[in-house]
């Protein structure tokens, strides 16, 4: 069960034990970070689960789909570390992953 470190918008750091196979979005919401809205429920159609991934982990993530990229284009806060947490499936290779919840658009 990998541990994921999440920084909330107010700077609080949460250490979350993650079940493999869940999306990062599910782990963050189940861990109590209510500010991650995920309005579409993880269907890659809203971009309200936007996170910034620690650059050290970017190569460990699956490639970004065109749909994910298009949705992130709508954010004023997109940068090279931006991902939608609903599109990242947690596995043991992500142990220690650090993400920050992106500012709300």
UniProtKB/Swiss-Prot annotation:
Biological process, per Gene Ontology: P450-containing electron transport chain
Keywords, in A-Z order: 2Fe-2S, Electron transport, Iron, Iron-sulfur, Metal-binding, Transport
Pfam family, one: Fer2
Cofactor(s) the protein requires to work: [2Fe-2S] cluster
Database matches in InterPro entries: 2Fe-2S_ferredoxin-like_sf, 2Fe-2S_ferredoxin-type, Adrenodoxin-like, Beta-grasp_dom_sf
PROSITE patterns: 2FE2S_FER_2
Note describing how the cofactor binds: Binds 1 [2Fe-2S] cluster.
MF terms (GO), sorted A to Z: 2 iron, 2 sulfur cluster binding; electron transfer activity; metal ion binding
Binding site for [2Fe-2S] cluster: 40, 46, 49, 86
Residue span(s) of domain 2Fe-2S ferredoxin-type: 2-105
Top-level taxon: Bacteria
Signal peptide interval: none
Quaternary structure (record): The chloroacetanilide N-alkylformylase multicomponent enzyme system is composed of an oxygenase component (CndA) and an electron transfer component formed by a ferredoxin reductase (CndC1) and a ferredoxin (CndB1). In vitro, chloroacetanilide N-alkylformylase assays in which CndB1 is substituted for CndB2 demonstrate that the two enzymes possess nearly identical activities.
Annotated family: Belongs to the adrenodoxin/putidaredoxin family.
Known function: Component of the chloroacetanilide N-alkylformylase multicomponent enzyme system involved in the degradation of chloroacetanilide herbicides (N-alkoxyalkyl-N-chloroacetyl-substituted aniline derivatives). In vitro, functions as an intermediate electron transfer protein.
Name of the featured protein: Chloroacetanilide N-alkylformylase 1, ferredoxin component
Gene source species: Rhizorhabdus wittichii (strain DC-6 / KACC 16600) (Sphingomonas wittichii)
């Amino acid at each position: 069960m990998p541990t994921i470190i999440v920084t909330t918008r107010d700077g609080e750091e949460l250490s979350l034990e993650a079940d493999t196979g869940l999306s990062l979005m599910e782990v963050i919401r189940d861990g109590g970070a209510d500010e991650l809205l995920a309005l579409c429920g993880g269907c890659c159609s809203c971009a309200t689960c936007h996170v910034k991934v620690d650059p050290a982990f970017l190569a460990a993530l699956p490639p970004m789909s065109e749909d994910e990229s298009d949705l992130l284009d709508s954010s004023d806060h997109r940068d090279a570390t931006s991902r939608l947490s609903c599109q990242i499936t947690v596995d043991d290779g992500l142990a220690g992953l650090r993400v920050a919840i992106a500012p709300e658009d």
